[in-house]
Amino acid sequence: MLIFAICILGAMSTWAKEKDSDSLNYEHGGSIWEVDNIALLDNDIKNEIDCTIENIITPEMSDYDKVKAVHDYIVLNCEYDYENYVNDTIPQDSYSPRGVLINKKAVCEGYAAAFKAFMDELSIPCKLVSGKASSNGDFTGRVNHAWNRVEVGGVWYQIDVTWDDPVPDQKGKVRYKYFLLSDEEMNKTHLQVRNEKKI
C-alpha cells in the first residue's frame, strides 16, 4: 500500500493506494473517500476542469501562459473561506478542488489541490507542497499551509495561488506576488516542512 499524508491547518489528509488497485482512498478529518484519481475526486470536478480549460486555454499558449491562465482563473473565481477558517468550522469541501471549482470557497489545501488538478490535465509537472507560511518570515507558531511547485520551461518554480487571492475577496483583482518564484524568493515567506510529493 502506498500512503501519502500531510497535515494542513491542524487536520491530517491521507491518500492511500492499494498495490494492485486503480483507486485511491482519501481521508481528511475522519472522512474517507475512494477516488479514481488523486487530484480529480469525482466526475463533476473533472468536467468543471475540462470545461474551464476549454474556455481559458488555447493551443498556441506556452506552459507559462497556461499556468498564468489557471492561476488567474482560480483567483478570480474562488474566495478564501475565511469565515469558516477563523471559526474553526472549515467544511471538508474547502480542503479539496471541489471547494474551488464547485463551491467557489476554499482554504489553501483546496487552492493547491485544484491548481495541481489543472496542471495534471494540462500535462504540466506540478507538486503539492506543505509547510508553514508567514508574511514576515517568522515561522514560529505559524499554521500549516499548502502551495505548489510547477515546472515551466524546464525550471521548477514555486507558486502560492492562495496568497495571490486577496482576503477579503476583491472581485476582479489578481496579485502576482507569489507567482512563479524561485526557491530563494519563496523561502523568505514559506517554509517547506515535509518532502514534496508528486501526487
Regions found by a protein language model. Name each.
Residues 8-20:
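Sec-dependent signal peptide cleavage junction
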Residues 17-47, 51:
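Low-complexity, acidic Ser/Thr/Pro-rich repeat tracts that form intrinsically disordered stalk/linker regions
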Residues 84-98, 107, 111-122:
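A conserved catalytic-loop motif detector
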Residues 110-183:
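Hydrophobic/aromatic-rich core segments of domains that either
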Residues 182-199:
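Catalytic cores of secreted or luminal carbohydrate-active enzymes
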